[in-house]
């Protein structure tokens, strides 16, 4: 009888904890946070920020580009990040709201960055600038600034794993792995490292599945829609069904190609009450390039096929240039 009583109480406690300390918030929450002097961080590129941002929001430019090495896509040296965040007045230990454009992973990367460096009072405004503008809230064109702060950042090991730690966790029944890449990446058809494939035991749930309409970016590209409303999150019950194969009490490691897309799913899982979520920061770029790390559906880049297609493309370019030159010559003779 005690066990029957204890389990529902545990579930209620977890639900209450999520409600009291959400990871993902709406515009009303952001407005209230601003009123109590929370920091608002706009992670979009500088050009987007300059066209209009939440009044008082600060910017360091495109956070994912500024804070990561362009080759490895891992974080740059911690002392450099200390200077960048410090000059912007971004202290991870303050209350911070992170936002970007609706649904994009960039805001979640900001969340993960702050958690990685010890932040525990950080939220994501998923619907971002579009929702804020639609609600008629204050927008500014003037850059906001906070007083600089001296930072000494330390990595929080509870929110991330290294490649070595990832390999050590393979076949651990208390660990579950989520691959948020496309299905083509997962099965090795789309190769973005030395080899394609996926980590053994991982289940594939592309991060776009968190949205009401995962096809929204493609529809925008095809001009089948004019807004990104479909990139709002699914209702909580739908998200719970999406991740019903997972145990919220187990260690859950999320990865993608470089730790960017996975940060969004990590944030969603935190919102759903998963208690031990980690982002594999180096993700497949690190794992796929570690050739002695076990992998499934392994494929390798076909250099011969690539060269053949490149040669065919060059032939086509040469033909078009020849046709263009002939057309110009004929035109000049008239």
How should each PLM-predicted stretch be described?
Residues 19-39, 46-97, 101-176, 180, ...:
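Rhodanese-like catalytic fold shared by cysteine-dependent sulfurtransferases
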Residues 5-16:
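Bacterial N-terminal signal peptides
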């Amino acid at each position: 009888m005690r066990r029957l009583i204890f389990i529902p109480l545990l579930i209620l406690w977890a639900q209450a904890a999520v409600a009291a300390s959400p990871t993902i918030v709406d515009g009303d929450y952001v407005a209230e946070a601003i009123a109590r002097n929370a920091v608002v961080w706009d992670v979009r590129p500088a050009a987007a920020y300059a066209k209009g941002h939440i009044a008082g929001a600060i910017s360091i430019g495109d956070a994912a580009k500024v804070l990561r090495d362009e080759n490895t896509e891992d974080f740059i040296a911690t002392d450099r990040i200390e200077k960048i965040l410090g000059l912007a007045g971004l202290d991870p230990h303050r209350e911070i709201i992170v936002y970007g454009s609706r649904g994009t992973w960039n805001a979640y990367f900001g969340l993960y960055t702050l958690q990685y460096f010890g932040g525990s009072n950080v939220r994501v405004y998923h619907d971002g600038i579009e929702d804020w503008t639609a609600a008629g809230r204050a927008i500014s064109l003037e850059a906001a600034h906070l007083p600089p702060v001296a930072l000494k950042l330390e990595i929080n090991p509870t929110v991330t794993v290294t490649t070595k730690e990832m390999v050590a966790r393979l076949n651990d029944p208390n660990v579950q792995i989520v691959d948020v890449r496309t299905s083509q990446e997962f099965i090795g058809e789309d190769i973005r490292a030395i080899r394609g494939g996926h980590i053994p035991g991982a289940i594939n749930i592309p991060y776009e599945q968190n949205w009401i309409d995962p096809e929204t970016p493609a529809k925008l590209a095809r001009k089948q829609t004019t807004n990104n409303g479909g990139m709002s999150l699914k209702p909580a019950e739908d998200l719970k069904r999406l991740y019903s194969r997972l145990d919220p009490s187990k260690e859950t490691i999320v990865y993608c190609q470089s730790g960017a897309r996975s940060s969004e799913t990590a944030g969603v899982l935190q919102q759903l009450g998963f208690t031990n979520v980690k982002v594999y920061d180096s993700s497949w770029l690190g794992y796929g390039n570690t050739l002695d790390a076990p992998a499934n559906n392994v494929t390798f880049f076909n250099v011969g096929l690539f060269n053949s297609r490149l040669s065919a493309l060059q032939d086509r370019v040469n033909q078009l240039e020849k046709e263009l030159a002939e057309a110009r010559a004929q035109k000049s003779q008239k």
